[in-house]
Amino acid sequence: MDFNQVKVINHPLIQHKLTIMRKKETSTVKFRTLMHEVSMLLAYEVTRDLEIEYEEIETPLATMQSPVLKGKKLVFVSILRAGNGLLDGMLQLVPTARIGHIGLYRDPKTLEAVEYYFKLPEHTQDRDVIVVDPMLATGNSAIAAVKEVKALHPKSIKFLCLLAAPEGISNFHGEHPDVPIFTAAIDEQLNDHGYIVPGLGDAGDRLYGTKLAH
């Protein structure tokens, strides 16, 4: 597997919070809070290479050339529903970002992604886009979502998740070798139900307090 396009974010705070999220006894409220906190930290890393330019400003003491973000506003694209759990923290860091949603569910028999909703901001072309979903398991949902985003010709695309499985990384980069993956951890494997092991369960169910269904 080629990991040149995979960035594992090993920040101690992220890893500590992720450990608590993994624990089966962690409550929905705590899980949701941690998701918010971790998403802010992940957003800091995934936006590290944004372009800047300089503008002249006046401080109380002098005039100076100071850096600001260059170009159009970012677009965050959430893969529903669990992707929404990452948005609040990211928006706290980048409040001017535009938001898109792609609704996909995983067919329980085939594990293929089925689209039921698609709405992205106007003028997504020429913008930097970050597609978010907590789990990169089989990779099918991420593959489908990024394909839709590519059709709009953005300036760049990144994929951000909490956990990734080796199978998901391989499948994703088999279809989108040009799109970098940012993740907090790469786990061992998928089980027969397509869940990441050891993982943290179903991120959407744990985030919204719904029952895990196999």
Swiss-Prot record:
Report the InterPro entries cross-referenced here: PRibTrfase_dom, PRTase-like, Upp_B, UPRTase/APRTase, Ura_phspho_trans
Cofactor notes = Binds 1 Mg(2+) ion per subunit. The magnesium is bound as Mg-PRPP.
Which pathway does it serve? Pyrimidine metabolism; UMP biosynthesis via salvage pathway; UMP from uracil: step 1/1
Which reaction(s) does its UniProt entry say it catalyses? Answer: UMP + diphosphate = 5-phospho-alpha-D-ribose 1-diphosphate + uracil
Tell me the residue numbers annotated for binding 5-phospho-alpha-D-ribose 1-diphosphate: 81, 106, 133-141, 202
Q: What class of enzyme is it?
A: transferase
Q: Which parts of the sequence bind uracil?
A: 196, 201-203
Q: What does this protein do?
A: Catalyzes the conversion of uracil and 5-phospho-alpha-D-ribose 1-diphosphate (PRPP) to UMP and diphosphate.
* UniProt protein name: Uracil phosphoribosyltransferase
Q: What's the source species for this entry? A: Legionella pneumophila (strain Lens)
Gene behind the chain? upp
